[in-house]
Amino acid sequence: MFMSQIVDIRAREILDSRGNPTIEADVILESGVVGRACAPSGASTGSREALELRDGDKSRYLGKGVRTAVQNVNSSIHELLVGQSVFEQKALDEKMIAFDGTENKSKLGANATLAVSLAAAHAAAAEQKLPLFQYIANLRGQTTLTMPVPMMNILNGGAHADNTVDIQEFMIEPVGFTSFAEALRAGAEVFHSLKSVLKKQGLNTAVGDEGGFAPNLRSNEEAITVILQAIEQTGYKAGSDIMLALDCASSEFYKNGQYILEGEGNKSFTSNQFADYLAGLVKQYPIISIEDGLDESDWEGWSYLTSILGDKIQLVGDDLFVTNPKILQRGIDEKVGNSILIKYNQIGTLTETLDAIYLAKANGYTTVISHRSGETEDSTIADLAVGTAAGQIKTGSLCRSDRVSKYNQLLRIEELTKAVYRGKAEFKGLK
């Protein structure tokens, strides 16, 4: 007999990987089972993301405290959900959404609702003696579990680094392997090889928020070149074993209708010119995925980008779709992009996150489950990626325990499930 009633909900202020406060929530059941989860936090954020509630009191944590969000959990959300069955994930989330009553969760804070929503799923899984990935799979009747292809951010520019490179993330995707464990090993080897390539050139090998290197390279193409050298040095083949992926985070350098690349001598591009610039990179290098290639408001530009590259590579909407099913539906209707980045703190509940994932899947869009640049030891996204058979996961580089905790959880899950690693099957145009 399950004792699934929620008897207590508690939240506290903890620190994330950048030393900023975030919120951790515990959901406690009648049986004594405790589910715990933490909310992550982003640096480059889409303007339509759900609101992360911060205190704004400059005398504490430079205004970044989350005491208000903690109080919202310990009072309003506590009153709302105590006494409910933890197995009613959708009902629990809908109660919080209805009570909040705003489009962007600005009353309770998406950091408050998300921490509770995920903690409830952890508690429910523990009460049923199920691994979290299996509980998540059961929520939507997902019968096939797969191991995701990792999108590894090994070189940083843009808002994630203090350097002259405009594109925010240069990533590798180890597609030519038969297991997640082997893919992870290849990624780690390339990461170490990249460090030695940079060292040889007298470049900085300190790492950024997500564990990637942020050397002072002269241009975006130079960043691609050093990664290709690192892949070659490890004995892998770029274009078959390992593909490249970019996150342009274009909204960060979109000013007055122009894309301005400071690292390229302040060159400015119109939407179509920048889309053509990206198409040129795809032609020249083994790039399989581009995220946020254009600004979140530039739907016309996105439409053109999709028309020239959409049948060749993955075009991921992050700031564009902000994990929001309504905005994703517009993208589907207008044939914009062909993939969605899933960041659950952009929307604020597990239920709405699953809605976005399954809407994407039903319409032939790939799904990439993602961390944020401000992370904790919480590894829920690893279970989410497997439990929804998402296909890909983006959780940073191959160092820093806030990133590696997700990879390690995926290794445990692979050992337990023997789930198939997606590899090349995940991508258009890869055989």
From Swiss-Prot:
Mg(2+) binds at D247, E291, D318. InterPro entries: Enolase, Enolase-like_C_sf, Enolase-like_N, Enolase_C, Enolase_CS, Enolase_N. The keyword Lyase applies. Its EC number is 4.2.1.11. Its cofactor is Mg(2+). The keyword Secreted applies. Keywords: Cytoplasm, Glycolysis, Lyase, Magnesium, Metal-binding, Secreted. One of its GO terms (molecular function) is phosphopyruvate hydratase activity. Signal peptide: none annotated. The active site is at E210, K343. Binds a second Mg(2+) ion via substrate during catalysis. Pathway: Carbohydrate degradation; glycolysis; pyruvate from D-glyceraldehyde 3-phosphate: step 4/5. Catalyzes the reversible conversion of 2-phosphoglycerate (2-PG) into phosphoenolpyruvate (PEP). It is essential for the degradation of carbohydrates via glycolysis. Component of the RNA degradosome, a multiprotein complex involved in RNA processing and mRNA degradation. This is Enolase. It comes from Acinetobacter baumannii (strain SDF).
